[in-house]
């Protein structure tokens, strides 16, 4: 399995090739993460991990599109980022982007709206919200993430996100997406990217 850790910093994912723009990190490849394309071939990786990076990039659309390009069909992209209600978000002057549970819906293969923005097609595997320690301890994090157990509980996430997230604050979001590069039309399968 070929793994890429994008924005690896000093704690590179075990067994991964590290990509970072800072030469003082554990990176194997130094490259400006805001400058695409990255120095990798199409469909090169089985797994891409990027922890606390997407909030720093200048163009989220270009970033996700580039991760999609270099991940093979059926590969996995894992992103971890602060939730927009995390009070620590504002303590880092290099943070540029805010995210919630629905921020990556534009990239989903089954998207209903905004399908003209991108050719990227991802399938959600995981979308987990980590709440502040107090709310985790009293079980509220479990309730917010019930939609991960069954789609019939989607309302719990949506209700929290839209009405309660500034009271029951989150720390971070963990996303996992499967890359979809094949499209079945008229019984034929063609590679999308």
List each language-model region with its residue ranges:
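Conserved SAM-binding loop
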Residues: 1-86
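S-adenosyl-L-methionine-dependent methyltransferase catalytic module, highlighting the catalytic core
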Residues: 61-62, 66-68, 76-193
């Amino acid at each position: 399995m070929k793994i890429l850790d994008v924005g690896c910093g000093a704690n590179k994912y075990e067994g991964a090739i590290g990509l970072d723009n800072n030469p003082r990190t554990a990176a194997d490849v130094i490259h400006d993460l805001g400058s695409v394309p990255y120095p990798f071939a199409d469909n090169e990786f089985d797994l891409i991990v990027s922890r606390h990076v997407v909030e720093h990039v200048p163009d989220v659309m270009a970033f996700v599109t580039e991760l999609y390009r270099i991940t093979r069909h059926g590969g996995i992209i894992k992103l971890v980022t602060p939730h927009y209600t995390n009070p620590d978000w504002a303590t880092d002057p290099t943070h540029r982007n805010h995210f919630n549970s629905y921020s990556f819906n534009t990239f989903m293969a089954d998207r209903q709206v905004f399908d003209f923005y991108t050719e990227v097609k991802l399938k959600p595997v995981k979308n987990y919200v980590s709440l502040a320690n107090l709310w985790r301890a009293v079980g509220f994090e479990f309730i917010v993430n019930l939609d991960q157990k069954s789609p019939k509980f989607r309302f719990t996430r949506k209700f929290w996100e839209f009405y309660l997230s500034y009271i029951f604050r989150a720390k971070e979001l963990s996303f996992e997406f499967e890359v979809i590069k094949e499209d079945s039309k008229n019984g034929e399968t063609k590679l999308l990217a």
